[in-house]
UniProtKB/Swiss-Prot annotation:
GO cellular component: endoplasmic reticulum; endoplasmic reticulum membrane
The protein's role, per its UniProt record: Alpha-1,2-mannosyltransferase involved in glycosylphosphatidylinositol-anchor biosynthesis. Transfers a fourth mannose to trimannosyl-GPIs during GPI precursor assembly. The presence of a fourth mannose in GPI is essential in fungi. Involved in plasmid maintenance with SMP2.
Disulfide bonds: none
Residues that span the membrane, as ranges: 6-26, 61-81, 176-196, 211-231, 271-291, 296-316, 318-338, 349-369
The keyword Transmembrane helix appears for this protein: yes
Membrane disposition: Multi-pass membrane protein
Key word Glycoprotein present: yes
Keywords: Endoplasmic reticulum, Glycoprotein, Glycosyltransferase, GPI-anchor biosynthesis, Membrane, Transferase, Transmembrane, Transmembrane helix
The protein's annotated pathway: Glycolipid biosynthesis; glycosylphosphatidylinositol-anchor biosynthesis
Organism: Saccharomyces cerevisiae (strain ATCC 204508 / S288c)
Protein's UniProt name: GPI mannosyltransferase 4
Cytoplasmic domain ranges by topology: 27-60, 197-210, 292-295, 339-348
Length: 516
């Protein structure tokens, strides 16, 4: 028992360390969450993503305010934290980590209570040592919150279809289920994809003979949904009547032309590419052992994969809510025990998760967060112009400025990148996000800033993987780059070129630009 407790504390500590790591997994963890909240609560200027523009109104403020609003309210009482973007970021990640651990301790056991103690221990151990638990679940993705909503839903539903409870009316659970359904839908429009098949089974087994309970579920869902609609209508205030964000989001995503902007993938991407990446060696257990067909969780897996694969924009994080189900719902057989107890499986599982945890929890695009966290300490009135090139979009809320101008590269209808909308006349407190544009556009940006008479500091933030490209920039003879700061733990996986091994160089460097 003592040995188990020490092992548990060690895993918790590893999770805490990675939770507080500087990695930056995907722009949406900032722009669909903290960026919006910081602008609401702290009145800083930042980047409004398309989903939160009144024209689209495709994301609900309700779940964000419900999950993170209390934390921001508490932080208002601590100015030393409220003014420090790194502390705000890590506070939010810590909250997510704690919420997931609570779910792990109180809800996951209910999904595996029919298993033998030894099997429960193995499944819980696999889930706790998954890199997804340490990274994706702690970052501020809507997918992370969707996981909690899905597990909560399935826990309640499993309880309702239990033979002991099937004859009861279950008014309380019906009300709870309606509230979670509403929250899940307004948090992410993909939530119904996971619960569609489980809902059909629940209706057939329970609600077709308990119509009063079904009425309560509908009433609860409608009431909470109306509250979310009123919140969004008040905030967006776009003059178009009531704002129903899940409906707007669904309409947007059903248009293939819209999805092309974000990237189209083959429909098998989730099944053949993303699934192996997200569960690793557990996939072997799934292949050899299969899943329990008498559990609603299995149908949530099938339902989620089926409906999410229908859409051609398929990112790995969309499958994050399935990870707990893919692990805990395995059909445990003697072959499963034999495989898990083999040293090669244990070693492969640990190696897979250590590597993925290092990438996703510590080094992936981490220089961005480190620089903006440091910038808080050395910022001055003469910020000048910060040009970001070949990095993920900087989370501009971390500048903590109420006087910030953000310009960005745009793609024209012909797919051509353009800097025509960059505010070259703004020479101070200006962030220019050039994303992954080619070198000529970077050169043109610097040239036009110079032509507009910019005498304030010009700063270039770019990964060390661009060493070869920067040498070409210097050959121009009119530009000199002086390294000011360097961050070793920055992994750029987006610009790897096997014909140029300098693109594998880790790190991010902040340069001062001198115009000769």
């Amino acid at each position: 028992m003592m040995r188990y407790q020490w092992w548990l504390y060690l895993v918790y500590a590893i999770g805490l360390m990675l939770c507080l790591g500087p990695s930056y997994i995907h722009p949406d963890e900032h722009f669909q969450c903290i960026e919006i909240l910081a602008m609401q609560f702290m009145k800083v200027k930042g980047t409004i993503p398309w989903e939160f523009k009144s024209k689209f109104a495709a994301r609900s403020y309700g779940p964000l305010l419900l999950v993170y609003g209390p934390l921001f309210t508490i932080l208002e009482s601590f100015p030393e934290i409220q003014d420090n973007p790194a502390l705000i970021l890590y506070s939010m990640r810590l909250q997510n980590y704690v919420m997931y651990l609570l779910c792990y301790h109180f809800l996951i056991p209910k999904l595996i209570r029919d298993e033998r103690k030894a099997v429960q221990f193995i499944k819980k151990s696999l889930l706790l040592t998954s890199y997804v638990t340490w990274t994706y679940q702690t970052h501020t993705f809507s997918n992370s919150i969707e996981t909690l909503a899905l597990i909560s839903t399935l826990t309640v539903m499993e309880d309702m279809v239990n033979e002991k409870n099937i004859q009861r009316s279950n008014f309380k659970n019906s009300v709870i289920l309606g509230l979670i359904f509403s929250f899940g839908v307004f948090n992410r429009v993909t939530f119904p994809a996971f619960i569609f098949l489980p809902c059909l089974i629940l209706f057939w087994k329970f609600y077709r003979v308990h119509w009063k309970s079904f009425s309560l579920l509908l009433l609860s869902f409608s009431f909470s949904s109306c509250l979310f609609v009123l919140i969004d209508t008040n905030i967006y205030n776009n003059g178009k009547g009531f704002v129903i964000t899940p409906l707007n989001n669904l309409k947007y995503n059903l248009n293939v032309q819209n999805l092309q902007v974000h990237g189209l993938h083959p429909r098998y991407t989730h099944l053949l590419v993303n699934l192996p990446q997200i569960v690793g060696p557990v996939l072997l257990l799934a292949i050899f052992s299969g899943y329990k067909l008498d559990k609603l969780s299995t149908y949530a897996i099938i339902s989620g994969l089926l409906f999410l694969s229908f859409f051609q924009h398929q990112e790995l994080r969309f499958l994050v809510p399935l990870v707990p189900l893919l692990v805990t719902n395995l059909n445990w057989t003697p072959l499963s025990s034999t495989l898990v107890n083999k040293k090669i499986f244990k070693g492969t599982w640990l190696l897979f998760n250590i590597i993925m945890a290092f990438i996703m929890g510590i080094s992936h695009q981490a220089g961005i967060i480190q620089f903006l966290g440091d910038y808080f300490h050395f910022r001055t009135e003469q910020m000048g112009v910060h040009i970001w090139w070949k990095t993920y979009s900087p989370p501009t809320w971390m500048y903590m400025s109420n006087n910030l101008t953000v310009s960005s590269l745009i793609n024209t209808q012909d797919g051509i990148e353009s800097i025509d909308e960059v505010a070259f006349s703004v020479g101070n407190h200006h962030v220019i996000d050039l994303k992954g544009c080619d070198l000529p556009l970077l050169t043109e940006t610097i040239r036009r800033l110079r032509l507009n008479g910019s005498i304030t500091p010009l700063t270039l933030v770019t990964p060390n993987s661009m060493t070869s490209e920067l040498k070409k920039l210097k050959r121009d003879g009119t530009i000199n780059l002086i390294p000011k700061r360097n961050y070793l733990f920055h992994l750029d996986l987006d610009h790897l070129d096997f014909n140029d091994f300098t693109t594998f160089k880790p790190g991010l460097t902040v340069y001062s630009i001198e115009l000769l």
